[in-house]
Amino acid sequence: MSSNKLLFFVDEGGFDDYTPLFARLGFSVDFENSQRKAVKLAKKNKYQVLVAEFSYNPEFRDRVSNIESLLATLESHSPEAKIIILFDKINQTQLDQLKQRYKTDCTLAFPVIEEKLMACFN
């Protein structure tokens, strides 16, 4: 089994499942669509990469997005993890706010082009 672990967090979905691509790149993939369960996984495992779907909801009172708890957990449990964010262009302003607070290595707007996603791993 691969020692390279990747956490793939999908909130709303509606895009391709990149799990086979991540496996071809040599990663053992944990796929999660529950933010709470993703945080639990991040506490239990050391990840080399997080690929997460960014969602903004104006009803969030104390945060900008759906992934802040996950990013905070990774900062303490897997600080070296590469952070790749997938997002809708209409949420660019909110993503920029998130990027001021948390490390991000690569951000890709939908529709995600597989070659650009692969380039994020280099």
Named regions from a protein language model:
Residues 8-10:
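Conserved acidic carboxylate
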Residues 12-31:
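Two-component/phosphorelay signaling modules centered on CheY-like receiver
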Residues 33-49, 55, 59:
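Acidic, metal-coordinating helix/loop segments flanking the phosphotransfer/catalytic sites
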Residues 37, 112-121:
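C-terminal output helix
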Residues 43-45, 73-80:
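Conserved phosphotransfer cores of two-component systems
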Residues 49-76, 92-94:
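Conserved phosphotransfer microenvironments
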Residues 62-65, 85-107:
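Alpha4 helix (beta4-alpha4-beta5 surface) of REC/receiver domains from two-component response regulators
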